[in-house]
Curated annotation (Swiss-Prot):
Residues noted as binding (6S)-5,6,7,8-tetrahydrofolate in the record, renumbered to the chain: L117, G121, H122, L123
Protein name: Serine hydroxymethyltransferase
E.C. number: 2.1.2.1
HAMAP family: SHMT
Keyword Nucleus: no
Pfam families the record matches: SHMT
ATP-binding recorded as keyword: no
Cofactor(s) required for function per UniProt: pyridoxal 5'-phosphate
UniProt source species: Symbiobacterium thermophilum (strain DSM 24528 / JCM 14929 / IAM 14863 / T)
Signal peptide range: none
Record's keyword terms, sorted: Amino-acid biosynthesis, Cytoplasm, One-carbon metabolism, Pyridoxal phosphate, Transferase
A GO cellular component annotation in the UniProt record: cytosol
Function: Catalyzes the reversible interconversion of serine and glycine with tetrahydrofolate (THF) serving as the one-carbon carrier. This reaction serves as the major source of one-carbon groups required for the biosynthesis of purines, thymidylate, methionine, and other important biomolecules. Also exhibits THF-independent aldolase activity toward beta-hydroxyamino acids, producing glycine and aldehydes, via a retro-aldol mechanism.
Subunit structure: Homodimer.
Length: 412
């Protein structure tokens, strides 16, 4: 980055500080990961100079013969990884992908079933503060109060009662496997389209460590970062019968020119999906999550649903007498990065919360395994237990830096 350093030292300095933060911190935000250097390089290419409205072979600009090659590579790799009939790799984000699906199949005011944000859903699944909840009539489904798992009987009952045009299955903070077969049966019963938002678990689904929603859903959306370990972006996978509607909804419906440099980075990331090393990585993500969850349980923490089937867990901090916001700030002081997160029926405000969400994808990318997860649980517990002891917090921070130094980011 010599040119950047010379031309804009202020921005360069901020980027370098972020590099250092990523290197020294234990990154436990479930939606974050570290992309391979090849993905970084692809995202920083001259493809950012090229406008390419339209699709390969059908562009509104000349000079697209090489970006067509790149987009086709990305499409074919994603299709192969999930066994999809059609894909669109142009959405700029997961939110844009969800928006495009709604735009393709719904009219303003149409009824949709989506998971309640307060119980693990996503903003774009019908939150009243989001465009989705303001544009469409979202009916929220939630969790069984006893098991804290999705109440599929409630989903079926709400579907029969409200006859939604679309049912959304997916989450941002739910640690268990979704029953895609049951969701599809409910959708068929009421004549609804089933959309699965697999943003969080896409990498696990591509490698057999989570059910593949493409087998049951009419349409699937995803981000391309998180467990896919690619650039920030989105994608849509669907049945061939919906290809025209989806493509028209993305362009010209929701977006103009695609980000061809990011599509190149997506293509590189999708190449991982057929790599045995990546499959082993996804398996380790799940093993690490189970190990970290068990270690926290053994230290007296309550986990929503009692554990995890995927890459994340939701920790209820009320028994420890600390809010999610305060825990996030506390752990940040010792170089452990988490995010505050509401727990089911959380009595605290959304910017305070009673819990934190923890995920294992990022530190698994750096090579950590079960033993390190136990160590991380111990560091978290010691920080929370001794949160008013500055000397102990200093010792914990030093131990964190010693641990991360053993697993360097971009070692070469």
């Amino acid at each position: 980055m010599d040119a950047l350093k010379r031309y804009d030292p202020e921005v360069f300095a901020a980027i370098q500080q972020e590099v250092e933060r990523q290197q020294r911190n234990i990154e436990l935000i479930a939606s974050e990961n570290f992309v391979p250097k090849a993905v970084l390089e692809a995202a920083g290419t001259v493809l950012t100079n090229k406008y390419a409205e339209g699709y390969p072979g059908r562009r509104y600009y000349g000079g697209c013969e090489y970006v067509d090659i790149v987009e086709n590579i990305a499409r074919e790799r994603l299709k192969a990884a999930f066994g999809a009939e059609h894909v669109n790799v142009q959405p700029h984000s997961g939110a844009n992908a969800n928006t495009a699906v709604y735009f393709a199949f719904l009219q303003p005011g149409d009824t949709v079933l989506g998971m309640n944000l307060a119980q693990g859903g996503h903003l774009t699944h019908g939150s009243p503060v989001n465009f989705s909840g303001r544009t469409y009539n979202f009916v929220p489904y939630g969790l069984d109060p006893e098991t804290e798992r999705i109440n599929m009987d409630q989903v079926a009952e709400l579907a029969r009662q409200h006859r939604p045009k679309l049912i959304v299955a997916g989450y941002s903070a739910y640690p268990r496997v979704l029953d895609f077969k049951r969701f599809r049966e409910i959708a068929e019963e009421v004549g609804a389209i089933l959309m699965v938002d697999m943003a969080h678990f896409a990498g696990l689904a591509a490698t057999g460590y989570y059910p593949n929603p493409v087998e049951h859903a009419h349409v699937v959306t995803t981000t391309t970062h998180k467990t896919l370990r690619g650039p920030r972006g989105g994608a849509i996978l669907c049945k061939k019968e919906f290809a025209k509607e989806i493509d028209k909804a993305v362009f010209p419906g929701m977006q103009g020119g695609p980000l061809m440099h990011i599509i190149a980075a997506k293509a590189v990331a999708f190449k991982q999906l057929s790599d045995p090393d990546y499959r082993a990585y996804c398996g380790q993500v799940v093993k690490n999550a189970k190990a970290l969850a068990q270690a926290l349980l053994e230290r007296g923490y309550r986990l929503v649903t009692g554990g995890t089937d995927n890459h994340l867990m939701l920790v209820d901090l009320r028994p420890k007498g600390i809010t999610g916001r305060d825990a996030e700030h506390l752990l940040d002081r010792v170089s452990i990065t988490v995010n505050k997160n509401a727990i089911p029926n959380d009595p605290e405000k959304p910017m305070v919360t009673s819990g934190i969400r923890i995920g294992t994808p990022a530190m698994t990318t750096r090579g950590m395994k079960e033993a390190e997860m136990v160590q991380i649980a111990d560091l978290i517990d010691r920080a929370i237990t001794h949160r008013n002891d500055e000397a102990e917090l200093d010792r914990i921070r030093a131990e964190v830096h010693e641990l991360t130094a053993r697993f360097p980011l971009y070692a070469d």
